[in-house]
Design a protein with these regions (language model features):
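Hydrophobic, well-ordered secondary-structure elements that form the walls
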Residues: 30, 77, 95, 114, ...
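Flexible loop/turn segments at secondary-structure boundaries
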Residues: 43-48, 80-84, 124-125, 149-152, ...
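C-terminal cap of metal-dependent C-N hydrolases
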Residues: 64-71, 90, 143-199
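Short, surface-exposed, low-complexity cationic segments
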Residues: 195-210
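Active-site neighborhoods of metal-dependent hydrolases
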Residues: 1-108, 147
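A general structural motif at alpha-helix termini
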Residues: 40-41, 118, 140
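Acidic, glycine-enriched loop/beta-strand segments at the rims
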Residues: 48-56, 62, 109-113, 123-156
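Conserved helix-loop functional segments at active or binding sites
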Residues: 97, 101, 120-124, 128
Length: 210
């Protein structure tokens, strides 16, 4: 843990600790924050859950990083850590970051370039036939509602994992992703996943590098 002042208690049998950070609790109890943290873990075990910031919290630095041509903005690592991370919506957060800078009249790149960095640039870098809208190509499209960027994209919630008997962390950004088409077939329609996705073939295919 880099800074216990950045770690906020989300769940705890002692409800008075929820919403507070470990550093404040330690000061209140006049103990070292590491001792406080370990004592709480021993006392509450897995019933103690907390949220912490591990990076990308300095927006000025983040804006510099996303402008660097050596930075490839692809996907997050959240899918490998379903119980303790949820930033599956990394591309949406990137677009909101760029839109916010433009709204403050401090633009760092156009939205068109930001979208290209998420699509065409990656197709070129990986050498796959993807990331562009051209006549005769597969129709792989995402339709976003710009008004949806007004919500907090860092919010996380719990959702049941079908057939696993446990919950995972998810991002829910209602109204932002309106439609998704994969190979010309609707995968998301009016913000809802279509029943055919994952149950019928034809939504995509292997894309070899060239």
């Amino acid at each position: 843990q880099r800074d216990f002042g950045d770690a906020i208690v989300l769940e705890c049998p002692d409800g008075s600790l929820v919403g507070r950070n470990f550093a404040d609790i330690a000061r209140e109890r006049s103990v070292h924050v590491v001792d406080l943290f370990l004592d709480l873990v021993v006392e509450f075990g897995r019933a103690l859950r907390w949220y912490t910031t591990v990076g990308n919290d300095r927006e000025d630095t983040l804006l510099k990083l996303v402008q660097d041509p050596r930075t490839l903005i692809t996907f997050s690592d959240a899918g490998a850590h379903i119980r303790n991370m949820a930033f599956y919506n990394l591309p949406l957060r990137f677009l909101k970051l760029i839109k916010g800078a433009a709204d403050r009249r401090q633009p760092v790149m156009t939205l068109e370039k930001a979208i290209w960095r998420l699509t065409g640039e990656q197709g070129e870098w990986f050498g796959i036939d993807a990331g562009r809208i051209r006549e005769g190509d597969r129709a792989d499209l995402v339709v976003l509602d710009p008004a949806g960027f007004d919500q907090d994209l860092q919010q996380v919630s719990w959702a049941e994992m079908e057939n696993f008997g446990l919950q995972r962390l998810v991002n829910r950004n209602p109204g932002l992703v309106r439609h998704v088409f994969i190979n010309g077939r609707a995968a998301v329609s009016d913000g809802e996943v279509t029943p055919e996705l994952g149950h019928e073939p034809g939504f995509g295919r292997f894309l070899p590098a060239h």
